[in-house]
Amino acid sequence: MNKHYYSLNDYLQNTFGEKVYKLSLDLGLTCPNRDGRLDTRGCIFCLAGSSHFSACEGDIFEKIDRAKQLVAKKTKAERFIAYFQSFTNTYAPTEYLKKVFTEAILREDIVALSVATRPDCLPDEVVALLAELNRIKPVWVELGLQTANEKTAEYIRRCYKNSVYTDAVMRLKSEGIQVITHIILGLPGETRSDMLASVDFAAKAGTDGIKLQLLHILRGTDLYEDYLKGSFSALTINEYMDILFECIERLPENIVVHRITGDAPKAHLAAPTWSADKKTVLNTINRELALRGIKQGRKA
């Protein structure tokens, strides 16, 4: 049991009675700020990847089985969460989504679906589909808010207003669907107050879970070009921990903390270089959590 915050592991143990693992799945989809509907460049921090929709990118059963083989190297778990992670996983024809999500959720080894998407890619028919699936097994929807600062949002090319996020949260929660919000700490130009305001904004909107992600500056991104110009600097580990811990203490106790850092492809990571060793970073964070006596909800 984590003494400092309501961790995802604690939530999974409480909900399913055992440790379950996420299976990261890629449907080969894209985003509206990549395919030209809103923009063609994508978010400023994002590496190029899938760029077109194809319903023939592999059978979902094969994808799940391959992901299970990877996880099997680390655990003997038998139950999993199907995590549709890459790009915008509701940005496709509803009939295709229904087929893929239904096939996944009906598997005996899948206990829940987690669907990462954009709040502007949740038309009523997709929300209705997710609600239908949620009556079978739990469905989580992960929304990439990143920041509640509209000026920063424009800079990172998020391409939607905060009101779109709050509306999506309201519509999903009205159907009993859990919402997870992704927030990036350390975005260019943001102050400590800006980052804390983003966490407060998500909590007030009613998010059930939160992912707190360190900004990674990756070679090959537009963000990297700005970094080379010296227009901003990456957070040090001490700066990151100071902000992270205050975020945790401002979160209500019932919000599940799904992530307190993140992974970046080492071959592309330009900064901060200290984040490359995730195990060491997590050990450092956990040690400091204890030393400082951090407690979620203390300042909520």
Where are these regions (language model features)?
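Hydrophobic faces of well-ordered beta-strands that scaffold small-molecule active sites
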Residues: Y21-L25, F80-Q85, L113-V115, V139-L143, ...
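A contiguous, low-structure linker/loop signature
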Residues: R66-R107, A112
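Short catalytic/ligand-binding loop motif for oxyanion handling, primarily in non-cytosolic enzymes
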Residues: P32-N33, S54-A55, Y91-A92, P265-L269
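Conserved non-cysteine loop/helix-boundary elements of the Radical SAM core domain that shape
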Residues: F53-G58, S86-K99, L113-E175, L185-G206, ...
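A structural motif corresponding to the C-terminal end of an alpha-helix
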Residues: R107-I110, A168-V179, A205, I243-I255
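Auxiliary Fe-S-binding modules of radical SAM enzymes
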Residues: N2-L12, G17-Y21, G209, I217-A300
